[in-house]
Protein backbone atom coordinates (compact mmCIF):
# COMPACT_ATOMS: atom_id res chain seq x y z
CA UNK A 1 0.00 0.00 0.00
CA UNK A 2 1.32 3.45 -0.89
CA UNK A 3 0.88 6.58 1.17
CA UNK A 4 -2.31 8.53 0.57
CA UNK A 5 -2.60 12.28 1.17
CA UNK A 6 -5.94 13.96 1.91
CA UNK A 7 -6.12 17.75 2.10
CA UNK A 8 -8.19 18.80 5.11
CA UNK A 9 -7.67 22.58 5.05
CA UNK A 10 -5.62 25.17 3.14
CA UNK A 11 -5.66 28.55 4.85
CA UNK A 12 -3.75 31.45 3.29
CA UNK A 13 -1.86 33.27 6.04
CA UNK A 14 -0.24 35.86 3.78
CA UNK A 15 -0.50 36.73 0.11
CA UNK A 16 1.77 39.75 0.04
CA UNK A 17 4.83 39.17 -2.16
CA UNK A 18 4.57 35.37 -2.12
CA UNK A 19 1.92 33.11 -0.58
CA UNK A 20 2.18 31.52 2.86
CA UNK A 21 -0.24 28.62 3.36
CA UNK A 22 -1.21 26.86 6.57
CA UNK A 23 -2.05 23.38 5.33
CA UNK A 24 -3.72 20.61 7.30
CA UNK A 25 -3.62 17.18 5.70
CA UNK A 26 -4.07 13.55 6.60
CA UNK A 27 -1.30 11.16 5.66
CA UNK A 28 -2.28 7.51 5.42
CA UNK A 29 0.81 5.50 6.20
CA UNK A 30 1.72 2.26 4.47
CA UNK A 31 0.41 0.33 7.47
CA UNK A 32 -3.01 2.07 7.15
CA UNK A 33 -2.63 4.42 10.12
CA UNK A 34 -3.81 7.99 9.43
CA UNK A 35 -1.67 10.81 10.79
CA UNK A 36 -2.84 14.45 10.75
CA UNK A 37 -0.21 17.08 9.95
CA UNK A 38 -0.40 20.86 10.06
CA UNK A 39 2.38 22.69 8.19
CA UNK A 40 3.17 26.13 6.85
CA UNK A 41 4.19 26.09 3.21
CA UNK A 42 5.77 29.05 1.43
CA UNK A 43 4.84 29.26 -2.26
CA UNK A 44 7.23 31.54 -4.11
CA UNK A 45 6.84 30.01 -7.55
CA UNK A 46 9.49 28.09 -9.46
CA UNK A 47 12.84 29.44 -10.57
CA UNK A 48 15.86 28.96 -12.78
CA UNK A 49 19.58 29.52 -12.30
CA UNK A 50 22.58 29.51 -14.62
CA UNK A 51 26.33 29.32 -14.23
CA UNK A 52 28.23 31.13 -16.96
CA UNK A 53 31.72 29.77 -17.60
CA UNK A 54 34.59 30.45 -19.98
CA UNK A 55 36.71 27.34 -20.54
CA UNK A 56 39.51 29.23 -22.34
CA UNK A 57 39.93 31.90 -19.67
CA UNK A 58 39.07 29.44 -16.85
CA UNK A 59 36.59 31.93 -15.37
CA UNK A 60 33.00 31.98 -14.15
CA UNK A 61 30.52 34.82 -13.80
CA UNK A 62 28.76 35.14 -10.45
CA UNK A 63 26.86 37.97 -8.81
CA UNK A 64 26.84 39.52 -5.36
CA UNK A 65 23.64 40.95 -3.92
CA UNK A 66 21.80 41.59 -0.67
CA UNK A 67 19.54 38.73 0.46
CA UNK A 68 17.31 39.73 3.34
CA UNK A 69 16.71 36.17 4.57
CA UNK A 70 20.45 35.63 5.09
CA UNK A 71 20.70 38.94 6.93
CA UNK A 72 17.82 37.95 9.24
CA UNK A 73 19.65 34.64 9.84
CA UNK A 74 22.91 36.25 10.98
CA UNK A 75 24.77 37.11 7.77
CA UNK A 76 25.93 40.52 9.00
CA UNK A 77 26.15 42.20 5.59
CA UNK A 78 23.32 40.21 4.01
CA UNK A 79 25.47 39.94 0.88
CA UNK A 80 25.52 36.63 -0.95
CA UNK A 81 27.68 35.51 -3.87
CA UNK A 82 25.60 33.37 -6.18
CA UNK A 83 24.76 32.30 -9.69
CA UNK A 84 22.39 34.38 -11.76
CA UNK A 85 18.81 33.31 -11.03
CA UNK A 86 15.20 34.38 -11.17
CA UNK A 87 11.60 33.29 -10.81
CA UNK A 88 9.88 31.83 -13.86
CA UNK A 89 6.72 33.87 -13.48
CA UNK A 90 4.91 32.69 -16.63
CA UNK A 91 8.05 32.03 -18.69
CA UNK A 92 9.59 28.72 -19.67
CA UNK A 93 12.79 28.03 -17.70
CA UNK A 94 15.15 28.69 -20.62
CA UNK A 95 13.38 31.94 -21.55
CA UNK A 96 13.56 33.05 -17.92
CA UNK A 97 17.25 32.32 -17.51
CA UNK A 98 18.22 34.07 -20.73
CA UNK A 99 16.35 37.17 -19.56
CA UNK A 100 17.91 37.01 -16.08
CA UNK A 101 21.41 36.51 -17.50
CA UNK A 102 21.28 39.72 -19.49
CA UNK A 103 19.60 41.71 -16.69
CA UNK A 104 21.87 40.52 -13.88
CA UNK A 105 25.22 39.78 -15.56
CA UNK A 106 25.01 41.74 -18.81
CA UNK A 107 25.82 38.65 -20.89
CA UNK A 108 23.61 37.55 -23.76
CA UNK A 109 24.09 33.79 -23.61
CA UNK A 110 24.10 31.53 -26.64
CA UNK A 111 23.57 27.80 -26.23
CA UNK A 112 22.42 26.82 -22.75
CA UNK A 113 22.45 23.33 -21.28
CA UNK A 114 19.81 22.26 -18.79
CA UNK A 115 21.27 19.97 -16.15
CA UNK A 116 18.50 19.10 -13.70
CA UNK A 117 15.61 20.35 -11.57
CA UNK A 118 15.82 20.33 -7.77
CA UNK A 119 13.77 21.26 -4.73
CA UNK A 120 16.15 23.22 -2.50
CA UNK A 121 14.10 23.35 0.72
CA UNK A 122 11.22 20.87 0.33
CA UNK A 123 10.27 20.84 4.00
CA UNK A 124 8.48 24.15 3.68
CA UNK A 125 9.09 25.84 0.31
CA UNK A 126 7.37 24.83 -2.95
CA UNK A 127 10.04 26.20 -5.31
CA UNK A 128 11.50 23.87 -7.95
CA UNK A 129 14.69 25.29 -9.48
CA UNK A 130 15.83 24.53 -13.04
CA UNK A 131 19.64 24.44 -13.28
CA UNK A 132 21.54 25.52 -16.41
CA UNK A 133 25.11 26.16 -17.53
CA UNK A 134 26.33 28.11 -20.54
CA UNK A 135 29.68 29.07 -21.94
CA UNK A 136 30.22 32.81 -22.36
CA UNK A 137 32.75 35.01 -24.13
CA UNK A 138 33.67 38.67 -23.82
CA UNK A 139 31.94 39.36 -27.15
CA UNK A 140 28.60 38.36 -25.59
CA UNK A 141 28.72 41.23 -23.08
CA UNK A 142 25.71 43.38 -24.03
CA UNK A 143 25.67 45.69 -20.99
CA UNK A 144 27.10 46.12 -17.48
CA UNK A 145 24.42 43.98 -15.82
CA UNK A 146 23.47 44.85 -12.27
CA UNK A 147 19.80 43.93 -12.37
CA UNK A 148 16.66 45.99 -12.79
CA UNK A 149 15.72 49.21 -10.98
CA UNK A 150 14.99 47.69 -7.55
CA UNK A 151 18.12 45.48 -7.52
CA UNK A 152 21.71 46.33 -6.61
CA UNK A 153 23.78 43.54 -8.15
CA UNK A 154 27.56 43.42 -8.50
CA UNK A 155 28.84 41.27 -11.37
CA UNK A 156 31.89 39.15 -10.52
CA UNK A 157 34.09 37.47 -13.11
CA UNK A 158 36.28 35.12 -11.09
CA UNK A 159 38.92 32.51 -11.84
CA UNK A 160 37.20 29.13 -11.53
CA UNK A 161 39.82 27.94 -9.03
CA UNK A 162 39.13 30.97 -6.84
CA UNK A 163 35.38 30.34 -6.91
CA UNK A 164 35.96 26.75 -5.76
CA UNK A 165 38.24 27.99 -2.97
CA UNK A 166 35.54 30.48 -1.91
CA UNK A 167 33.26 27.53 -1.14
CA UNK A 168 35.88 26.16 1.26
CA UNK A 169 36.43 29.55 2.93
CA UNK A 170 32.70 30.16 3.35
CA UNK A 171 32.61 33.16 1.02
CA UNK A 172 30.19 31.25 -1.22
CA UNK A 173 27.34 29.78 0.84
CA UNK A 174 24.51 29.65 -1.65
CA UNK A 175 23.30 26.10 -2.33
CA UNK A 176 22.54 26.47 -6.02
CA UNK A 177 25.92 28.09 -6.63
CA UNK A 178 27.83 25.37 -4.78
CA UNK A 179 25.95 22.71 -6.78
CA UNK A 180 26.71 24.33 -10.13
CA UNK A 181 30.37 25.03 -9.36
CA UNK A 182 30.84 21.43 -8.22
CA UNK A 183 29.03 20.17 -11.32
CA UNK A 184 31.36 22.23 -13.51
CA UNK A 185 34.37 20.77 -11.71
CA UNK A 186 33.11 17.17 -11.96
CA UNK A 187 32.18 17.57 -15.64
CA UNK A 188 35.79 18.48 -16.55
CA UNK A 189 34.53 21.25 -18.85
CA UNK A 190 37.21 23.53 -17.40
CA UNK A 191 40.12 21.08 -17.90
From Swiss-Prot:
Residue ranges of every copy of the Nudix hydrolase domain listed in the record: 43-180
Annotated EC: 3.6.1.-
Domain of life according to the entry: Bacteria
Entry keywords, A to Z: Hydrolase, Magnesium, Metal-binding
GO biological process assignments: nucleoside phosphate metabolic process; ribose phosphate metabolic process
Binding site for GDP-alpha-D-mannose: 17, 38-40, 67, 85-87, 104, 127, 150-151, 176
CDD domains associated with the record: NUDIX_GDPMK (cd24157)
GO cellular component, one term: cytosol
Enzyme class: hydrolase
Cited Gene3D superfamilies: Nucleoside Triphosphate Pyrophosphohydrolase
Reaction(s) catalysed (UniProt annotation): GDP-alpha-D-mannose + H2O = alpha-D-mannose 1-phosphate + GMP + 2 H(+)
Residue numbers covered by motif Nudix box: 86-106
Physiological role: Nucleoside diphosphate sugar hydrolase that hydrolyzes GDP-mannose as its preferred substrate, yielding GMP and mannose-1-phosphate.
Domain comment, as recorded: In the dimer, the N-terminal domains are swapped between the two monomers, such that residues of both chains contribute to the active site.
Official protein name in the record: GDP-mannose pyrophosphatase
Species of the source: Escherichia coli O1:K1 / APEC
GN (gene name): nudK
Amino acid sequence: MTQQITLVKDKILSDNYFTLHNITYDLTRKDGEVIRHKREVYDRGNGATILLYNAKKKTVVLIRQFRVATWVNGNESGQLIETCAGLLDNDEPEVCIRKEAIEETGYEVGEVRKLFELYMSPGGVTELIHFFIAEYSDSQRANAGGGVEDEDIEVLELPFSQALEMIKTGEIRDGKTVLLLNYLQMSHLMD
